[in-house]
Amino acid sequence: PEVIIADEPTTALDVSIQAQILALLRGLARQRGTAIMLVTHDMGVIAEIADRVGVMYAGRLVEIGPVAAVLHSAHHPYTAGLMGLIPSLSRRVERLPQISGNMPRPGEWPGGCSFHPRCPKAGPRCTIEVPAPVAVSDSMVACHLFSGGTSVVSGDLPTKEAISTRETAS
């Protein structure tokens, strides 16, 4: 296969079994020359195994880019909110942070950007129009805050060839 899809392959596993599963996935991908599409909520696993990461909210891709760029310099307000939820070992807090509001119920998606009811930066356009992905630095972001970027076709993701060409050119 050209891609191995692993949906939450390390959820609820202890650290040693998790490491074995990740090593197995890496070995299979290397041996067969395939990519791995990892579906997970575990940011530690993403940081360890992935080259690129896509962040989804309510079934829509809101940001995609190199792991380091997305994890350390998130552009989309949802991605930035997620990164802000990761507890710091160097800082003691009495209450863990959270993203305000609630996820919409399946089938009851709001109009426009699905994150707008929870977004601290939402404007009127966000309630009406679904944002098209735009190129921002090395990432693609579906957010009206970045509408001055280079537009891409809505839902269009970079191909494997485009990614390797862009990375080779850098």
Task: Briefly describe each language-model feature range.
Residues P66-I163, S170:
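Short catalytic/signature loops enriched in Gly
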Residues V15, I21, G44, S154, ...:
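Intrinsically disordered and other compositionally biased segments
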Residues P1, I5-P9, L13-R95:
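P-loop NTP-binding/switch modules centered on Walker-like glycine-rich loops
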